[in-house]
């Protein structure tokens, strides 16, 4: 069972405001960022019996791991001598599944404001509204936005023809797809489409790709089987029919010759640009674009709002995934104490605690 995922089209558009809108989603905790640290934050909150919704601007969970190095090996995760970014994210999604978090993907948190009752109003770029008892900012180095392709003819195309996000394989069936880019994301998109029987070409300015060796070998195998067509060159013009539907892309090869590549769908991966975004306007104390936190609780200058992972700053800070896991653990404990000040808080172990094992689904509810 995987966490529930909602795209902007699947979430209700609620008008903003500080009141308790009938359509606002009420939750124990809202986690901003679905990277490894954000996902582990969900797990630690689940152990405190605090339920979560998660918002991320990217179209898939995983943050930098999924977008920047999905196939590159990671060697410093405890008990995993080596794993890829994709594998790490998949394992974390499996780990949080017992707590049924809802992932709101492809939207950015735009507003955060404290309420008189101690909770927080949060609004996203998709119009989704939340009322949360605690907020956890796990935004990494900021919200990632894809670098946009600027190409003559592109702005006249129907919106469905061009995307800077990962392709939906099922929606690409029967289409002729051109992927532009040479990084891990571009190669993964082209390979995944080809592996599902989609006619796909890959266009990059060089015949050497700045991608993980595993991805390059995967591409080369598919190309040798005639399942991916590789082109070298720079795109110069998007072509469309009278209805604004993409018909192909002209490109200039290294010798200066112009070629036309037929395509009905264009997917662009030119890298991602992190930006701080609206976070800087929320009134939180910052230094050099990082959130100041108290390192025993990882609480920001606004009580009830916590920051974990690469977005925070404190003496001795190390920007490592494993350090973010530690921060998420202490932040979850701090939030539980704040939200339930009169409840006993004892350190429990998942190996022996029946309560934790019930939360994890290892024991049925009501079992001793």
From Swiss-Prot:
Q: What class of enzyme is it?
A: oxidoreductase
Q: Which SUPFAM superfamilies match?
A: FAD/NAD(P)-binding domain
* Chain positions recorded as FAD binding sites: 56, 64, 69, 109, 144, 310, 351
Q: Which cofactor does it need?
A: FAD
Q: Name one Pfam family in it.
A: Pyr_redox_3
Q: Which reaction does it catalyse?
A: 2 reduced [2Fe-2S]-[ferredoxin] + NADP(+) + H(+) = 2 oxidized [2Fe-2S]-[ferredoxin] + NADPH
Cross-referenced InterPro entries: FAD/NAD-bd_sf, Fd--NADP_Rdtase_type_2, Ferredoxin-NADP_redctase_2
Q: For this protein, what does the record note about how its cofactor is bound?
A: Binds 1 FAD per subunit.
Q: Name one GO molecular function term.
A: NADP binding
Q: What is its EC number?
A: 1.18.1.2
Flavoprotein keyword on record: yes
Alphabetically sorted, this entry's keywords are:
FAD, Flavoprotein, NADP, Oxidoreductase
Q: Which domain of life, per UniProt?
A: Bacteria
Has UniProt tagged this entry with the keyword Flavoprotein? yes
Similarity remark: Belongs to the ferredoxin--NADP reductase type 2 family.
PANTHER family this protein is in? THIOREDOXIN REDUCTASE 1-RELATED-RELATED
Describe, as the record does, how this protein assembles with itself and its partners. Homodimer.
Q: What is this protein called?
A: Ferredoxin--NADP reductase
Species annotation: Leptothrix cholodnii (strain ATCC 51168 / LMG 8142 / SP-6) (Leptothrix discophora (strain SP-6))
């Amino acid at each position: 069972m995987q966490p529930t995922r909602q795209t902007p089209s699947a979430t209700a558009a609620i008008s903003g405001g500080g009141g308790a809108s009938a359509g606002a989603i009420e939750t124990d905790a809202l986690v901003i960022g679905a990277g490894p640290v954000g996902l582990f934050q969900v797990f630690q909150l689940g152990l405190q019996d605090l339920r979560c919704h998660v918002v991320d601007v990217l179209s898939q969970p995983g943050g930098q791991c999924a977008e920047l190095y999905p196939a590159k090996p990671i060697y410093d995760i405890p008990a995993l001598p080596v794993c890829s970014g994709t594998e790490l994210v998949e394992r974390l999604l499996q780990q949080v599944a017992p707590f049924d978090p809802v992932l709101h993907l492809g939207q950015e948190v735009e507003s955060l404001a404290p309420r008189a009752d101690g909770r927080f109003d949060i609004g996203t770029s998709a119009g989704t509204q939340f009322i949360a008892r605690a907020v956890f900012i796990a935004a990494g180095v900021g919200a990632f936005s894809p670098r946009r392709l600027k190409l003559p003819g592109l702005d006249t195309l129907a919106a469905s023809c061009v995307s800077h996000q990962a392709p939906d394989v099922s929606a690409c069936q029967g289409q002729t797809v051109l992927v532009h880019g040479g990084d891990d994301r571009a190669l993964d998109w082209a390979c995944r489409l080809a592996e599902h029987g989609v006619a796909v070409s890959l266009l990059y300015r060089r015949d050497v790709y700045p991608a993980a060796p595993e991805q390059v070998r995967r591409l080369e195998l598919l190309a040798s089987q005639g399942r991916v067509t590789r082109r070298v060159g720079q795109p110069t013009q998007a072509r469309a029919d009278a209805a604004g539907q993409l018909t192909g892309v002209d490109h200039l090869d290294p010798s200066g010759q112009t070629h036309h590549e037929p395509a009905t769908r264009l997917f662009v991966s030119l890298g991602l640009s992190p930006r701080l975004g609206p976070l800087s306007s929320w009134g939180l104390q910052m230094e050099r674009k990082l959130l100041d936190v108290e390192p025993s609780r990882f609480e920001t200058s606004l009580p009830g709002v916590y920051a974990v992972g690469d977005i925070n700053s404190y003496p001795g800070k190390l920007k490592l995934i494993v350090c973010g896991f530690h921060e998420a653990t202490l932040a979850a404990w701090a939030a539980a104490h704040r939200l339930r000040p009169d409840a006993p808080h004892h350190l429990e172990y998942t190996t022996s605690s029946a309560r934790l094992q019930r939360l994890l689904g290892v024991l049925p509810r009501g079992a001793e």
